Amino acid sequence: MTRSVWKGPFVDAYVLKKAEAARDSGRNEVIKIWSRRSTILPQFVGLTFGVYNGQKHIPVNVTEDMIGQKFGEYSPTRTYYGHAADKKAKRK
């Protein structure tokens, strides 16, 4: 179920503060955030966020296509190594 329209998008307050500070400073550095649940807003376009995946910060360059998505969608938490090969089939 999607979020109610009347509530508006959810963004942690510290993410907004960090984004505003980065915009004002003009420096293009990675903004480290831990809030995977925050929604990407239009004012974040052009900024680079380091989204934490449980081990490290994954750099995410925000584009216009990402608006409305969550930061967590661009920072995978699990590594897929593929299915294990069938040992019986290898012996033949």
Swiss-Prot record:
GO terms for biological process: ribosomal small subunit assembly; translation. Pfam families: Ribosomal_S19. The keyword Ribosomal protein applies. The keyword Iron-sulfur does not apply. One of its GO terms (cellular component) is cytoplasm. It comes from the Bacteria. Keywords: Ribonucleoprotein, Ribosomal protein, RNA-binding, rRNA-binding. GO terms for molecular function: rRNA binding; structural constituent of ribosome. Belongs to the universal ribosomal protein uS19 family. Protein S19 forms a complex with S13 that binds strongly to the 16S ribosomal RNA. This is Small ribosomal subunit protein uS19.
